[in-house]
Amino acid sequence: AKVVVKPTTFKADEVRLGVVGKGGLSLLSDEEYYMGEMMPAVNSMSGVGKFSATELKKQLSGKTASVQPSVENYTSAMGGVCSPKDIETMLQLLYLNFTQPRFNKDDVDNLTKMLLAQLANAKSNPDFLMQEKVTDVTYGHNPRRQMISTEIVNKFDFEQLPGIYAK
């Protein structure tokens, strides 16, 4: 691991943290790809450790600290922001995101329903349909380059989420 500290005079009341690891979505199979891509949304909706997203907001009341996971094709990352007095809280959130991610079936089901509703609306938009065709033709029906669809969302498997997150 490599730690870089860079003090600046830009914002004296803010501390930023960035953690980046190699791998990202490239470590996942084609079948796992879209579940991996949705992982930051799942994390945001589910909370961490023993805290649901709602409980976590209550615990962080009065504090300025957050950590948000993200994933790209070749990297996984976590970004954090806090006030100087809340550095310990931000580091605790980082630790929980690494060691105790939370996966709540109800939250994942809600995310799935939301995506399906958005896709149903998008199917009536000619721009969406055109973009879908352009993407298919441009990338030769590559499973990692197709636009998300109801078929893909319906294949989401809650039981696979912890294993995908660990990769």
Task: Show which residues each predicted segment covers.
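Short, intrinsically disordered, charge-balanced linker/junction segments flanking boundaries
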Residues: 1, 31, 165-167
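N- or domain-start disorder-to-order transition segments that initiate the globular core
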Residues: 1-12
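Short structured motifs
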Residues: 4, 63-64, 160-162
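Residues embedded in well-ordered secondary-structure elements
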Residues: 6-8, 67, 166
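M16 family metallopeptidases and their MPP-like homologs
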Residues: 11-44, 48-100, 111-120, 126-155
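Non-catalytic, conformational "gating/processing" segments within enzyme and secreted inhibitor domains
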Residues: 132, 158-167
